[in-house]
Structure formats: C-alpha cells, structure tokens
Swiss-Prot record:
UniProt organism field: Wolbachia pipientis subsp. Culex pipiens (strain wPip)
EC number: 7.1.1.-
Cofactor note: Binds 1 [4Fe-4S] cluster.
Keywords assigned by UniProt, alphabetized: 4Fe-4S, Cell membrane, Iron, Iron-sulfur, Membrane, Metal-binding, NAD, Quinone, Translocase, Transport, Ubiquinone
Entry cofactors: [4Fe-4S] cluster
Function: NDH-1 shuttles electrons from NADH, via FMN and iron-sulfur (Fe-S) centers, to quinones in the respiratory chain. Couples the redox reaction to proton translocation (for every two electrons transferred, four hydrogen ions are translocated across the cytoplasmic membrane), and thus conserves the redox energy in a proton gradient.
Protein name as annotated: NADH-quinone oxidoreductase subunit B
Entry keyword annotation includes Hydrolase: no
NCBIfam families: nuoB_fam, PRK06411.1
Family classification: Belongs to the complex I 20 kDa subunit family.
Subcellular location per the Swiss-Prot or TrEMBL entry: Cell membrane
Topological relation to the membrane, as annotated: Peripheral membrane protein
Length: 167
C-alpha cells in the first residue's frame, strides 16, 4: 500500500527537496546534477565580447568554482559560447564546430551582435543572430555584456540543465 500523488503534488515535493523515490526520476536528477556542475565551454570569440568573456575566467569571477572550465577543443566541450559579430563566412565554421561537439550540447549567445546582429544588423555580410545557424539555449544581452552578465547566463544554463527531463 502506498500513497498516490498527482503530477502537481509530485513536482511540488521534488522542488522542495524531498527524497525522490521513482528510480527514473532519481537517475535523471543525478545525471542533471552532475552535468550542471561540470560545464566545459568552448569559446567562439569573434569580437569585443570575447575580451569580456576572458574576465569571467579571472580571479575576481572565477568560473572554476562553479565547475566551469574552458576547453579548446569542441570534442571536449559541451557548451559553446558565441561572442561577437557572426559574419556569413563564419557561419559555416560555427555550424561545423557545433556538429563536432558531443551530445548533450548547449549554446550561449553572448552580446547584441551574436543575439541579433547588433550594431551591424543591416550589413549585408552579418548573420542576424547565431540562432539562425545553431540552436541557442541562453541569450546574454549587452554591448558588450559584463562579466557578471555572462556569469548569470551560465548559472541560468545550469538551472536549465537541472530542470531537463532525460529520455
């Protein structure tokens, strides 16, 4: 004999930190907790936003304490940070690098230029947002966005991963 909970009750108890007893939910919780605590981003710096991205790795913000360690190879990374103006010629390279990443893969669009073309929106050679080339999970606004904004975006990505339901 047991207690039957509706979906709403089950989700409420799970959010409040009660022990999860369904085996599938337990496995999902553990996998998502591990994934969110060890993000390995690869930088795809194209303009001035890449300089601000370097600040987040410095001692003041220290992304390492959140388990975020930058990688140089797309085969080792699970997050790609697109920072700066994406031109039409670089779009194919962006897609190729994205395809080389292992699943599950996430994309963070950093800055106004990567989000929607920014200052160069009406230029013939600029892609109006990297979401036209790769699927984007988190948008970080600003021109250029501050290191705090990127840090907040990475924390939002961690929360999104924790909420993900695995199949």
């Amino acid at each position: 004999m047991g207690i039957n909970l509706s979906n709403g009750d089950w989700n409420r108890y799970k959010k409040e930190g009660f022990l999860i007893t369904k085996f599938g939910d337990l496995i999902d919780y553990i996998m998502n907790w591990a994934r969110s605590g060890s993000l390995w981003p690869m930088t795809f710096g194209l303009a001035c936003c890449a300089v601000e991205m370097m600040h987040t790795a410095s001692s003041r913000y220290d992304l390492d304490r959140y388990g975020i360690i930058f990688r140089a190879s797309p085969r080792q990374a699970d997050v790609m940070i697109v920072a700066g103006t994406l031109t039409n010629k670089m779009a194919a390279a962006l897609r190729k690098v994205y395809d080389q990443m292992a699943d599950p893969k996430y994309v963070v669009s950093m800055g106004s230029c990567a989000n929607g073309g920014g200052y160069y929106h009406y230029s013939y050679s600029v892609v109006r947002g990297c979401d036209r080339i790769v699927p984007v999970d988190v948008y970080v606004p600003g021109c250029p966005p501050t290191a705090e904004a990127l840090l907040y975006g990475m924390l939002c990505l961690q929360n999104k991963i924790k909420r993900t339901k695995n199949i």
